[in-house]
Each structure stands twice: as structure tokens, then as C-alpha cells.
């Protein structure tokens, strides 16, 4: 019997996408934060953007094979801003400011239609609810959930930036399961990527998995084994609330 439903954040509870406007705004955001802290890079915008993007690629090359998440000062001080002579100690005072800004600026984010109605329906069934999210910011997910007006629906919010583990690593799921005090077999997981949100819960023995497409799905779901299938595929997240889970 399913008594707990856990959700991915970006691409699942919210629509998320990147375009030229958001790419430009996020680079400008980095420059603005650095200048506010007395650091002027004295470099043209295009070269700055190339260096920052190369830094993110370096971090991705470290992070993805290990399924690990570093803290903001490590990400920005040891990967993203190293071309500018900055390091963990120098960026530590404003690393989370950079991380938070990047998450809400590099990505356009809007709450998916029918999320509140779906959460209300699950609450009405007595379900425990939680979020498990890969994120490079310590606080952004909490703040955005509050901005959407849905923070209070969730008994737990587990983040890779806090645990140090990224989906599909089993440890991030285990942290959430301990927080909500549920067994894997009694949990359903809802996400937009097979490579993280379906493979991870299947390996953990979750009772059900839901998959919903997003902008990120094709970007992240490369080289996924053909036999990896969710229990349910949905087009409208509201379907989670009326699928027969019990």
C-alpha cells in the first residue's frame, strides 16, 4: 500500500527551461554579485561567459560520474570561478548568494498547472509528501516552494546540496525515507527523468514510479537502458492524485 509520495522539483513540480535570455541574465548576475563584493573581473562579457560556462562543465565532469554534490563555496571556488583567480576561501562569504541566483536566473521556473490541486488531493487521501531535489543551492528550493505557496504540503525536503549525494545515488533517497519514516515499498516517486527519477526509486524498491516529460527529459536521459520503465507515465501532474495507489 502506498502511503507516501515523493517528488522531484525542477521539471516536475515546476516547469523549467533555459534560453538565451536566461543564460545572459545568469552571467550578468554573477558579475553583479562579484562587483557588490568588491571584485571587478575587467573582462568582456563574452569571454566571461565562456569561462563561467567552462567552469560549470568542469564541475559537471567531476559531479556526474560520482553522483555527488559539493557545497556552494566548493562549486564556485574550485570549479566555476577558478579562471578568475578566485578560490573557496575568497568566495565563501557570497557563494550561496551566487548559487541561489544561478538556480533562479539561469533557469526559467514556473509552477506546473494543477500542482496545488494534486497536492490537495493527495493530502486528502492521507498521503505523506516530500521533495527530493538535485540542486547546487542550499536554500533555493525551500524559498521557491514558499513562493509557490506549497511549502507546507511537504513533510520533508531533501536536497543534494545538503546531503552531498545526487539522484540516482541511493543515499539521497535513504535520507528522505528516514525523514518521512516510510519504507520504500510504501512510496511512490514522481519525476521527469528516467536516469534519476525512475532508475533511483526502482533500485531502492519503491512501490511505484511516475514519469512526466519536461524540458530536461531529453537532455538528461541519454544512454538509459531500454528496460527502464516507470509504473505510470502522465501528461498532467494532476493524474498522480487520482491514480489508484492503494
Q: What are these language model-derived features?
A:
Residues 243-246:
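Conserved small/polar residues in nucleotide/adenosyl-binding loops
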Residues 188-229:
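Acidic, Mg2+-coordinating phosphoryl-transfer loop and its flanking beta/alpha structural elements
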Residues 232-236:
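Short acidic-hydrophobic, aromatic-tinged amphipathic segments that line or gate anion-handling sites
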Residues 1-49:
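Active-site neighborhood of HAD-like aspartate-dependent phosphohydrolases
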Residues 67-74, 92-93, 100-129:
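Short, acidic loop-to-helix structural element flanking the phosphoryl-transfer center
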Residues 166-198:
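Conserved Lys-Pro-Asp/Glu-containing loop-to-beta segment of HAD-superfamily phosphomonoesterases
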Residues 123-130, 135-158:
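Substrate-recognition/cap helix-loop segment adjacent to the acidic, metal-dependent catalytic center
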Residues 45-99:
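A metal-dependent, Asp-based hydrolase signature
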Amino acid at each position: 500500500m502506498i502511503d507516501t509520495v515523493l517528488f522531484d522539483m525542477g521539471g516536475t513540480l515546476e516547469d523549467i527551461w533555459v534560453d538565451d535570455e536566461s543564460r545572459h541574465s545568469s552571467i550578468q548576475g554573477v558579475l553583479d554579485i562579484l562587483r557588490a563584493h568588491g571584485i571587478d573581473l575587467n573582462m568582456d562579457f563574452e569571454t566571461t561567459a565562456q569561462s563561467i560556462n567552462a567552469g560549470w562543465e568542469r564541475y559537471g565532469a567531476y559531479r556526474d560520474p560520482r553522483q555527488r554534490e559539493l557545497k556552494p563555496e566548493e562549486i564556485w571556488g574550485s570549479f566555476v570561478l577558478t579562471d578568475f583567480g578566485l578560490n573557496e576561501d575568497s568566495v565563501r562569504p557570497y557563494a550561496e548568494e551566487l548559487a541561489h541566483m544561478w538556480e533562479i536566473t539561469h533557469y526559467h521556473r514556473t509552477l506546473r498547472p494543477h500542482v496545488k490541486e494534486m497536492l490537495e488531493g493527495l493530502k486528502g487521501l492521507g498521503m505523506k509528501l516530500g521533495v527530493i531535489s538535485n540542486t547546487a543551492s542550499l536554500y533555493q528550493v525551500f524559498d521557491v516552494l514558499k513562493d509557490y505557496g506549497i511549502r507546507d504540503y511537504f513533510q520533508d525536503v531533501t536536497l543534494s546540496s545538503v546531503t552531498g549525494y545526487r539522484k540516482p545515488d541511493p543515499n539521497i533517497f535513504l535520507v528522505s525515507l528516514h525523514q518521512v519514516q516510510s519504507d520504500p515499498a510504501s512510496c511512490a516517486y514522481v519525476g521527469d527523468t528516467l536516469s534519476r527519477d525512475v532508475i533511483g526509486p526502482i533500485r531502492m524498491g519503491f512501490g511505484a514510479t511516475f514519469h512526466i516529460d519536461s524540458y530536461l527529459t531529453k537532455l538528461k536521459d541519454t544512454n538509459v537502458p531500454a528496460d527502464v520503465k516507470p509504473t505510470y507515465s502522465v501528461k498532467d501532474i494532476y493524474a498522480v492524485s487520482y491514480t489508484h495507489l492503494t
